[in-house]
Amino acid sequence: MKSRFSIPEFCLSHWLLRIPLAIVFLQQGLSKLPFSLEDAEAFDLPGLVWWFVIYGEIGAGIGLLVGGIMTKPWLPILERCYIPDIGDAITRFSGITICSIMTGVIWVGQPDSLMDVILYDNLHVFLWVGGLVFALRGNRLT
């Protein structure tokens, strides 16, 4: 006997993780502009590292959104040149960038132990895990 009810498929549920993560990284990156060496020195970082952090955060936020949009050819003109793997690669690279930045943030905090990170630095751990999800799964979260 066939059931009348079935579990709905939530094929767009990846946006529930993608949008907040992108907003956090865009907001953090844009709040660091304009670039200044004084801000870098406040965290004992070289200027070049600070520059990569700023543009890495902005790029990762934009990359998560663009990579998600590129899952389908939304415009008819894009159907001829549509390559789904490009959106997946952008999403994965953005996830790797997020993991790298969050590893640096946790490292700069100089925690005493791994338990201190897990118990008291949970926001950064959650952001790191969110980046790890997109780095490992890309656009294939469904």
Segment roles from a protein language model:
Residues M1-P34, W50-T142:
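Extended, low-polarity transmembrane helix blocks
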Residues E38-G47:
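Perimembrane loop-to-helix junctions flanking transmembrane segments
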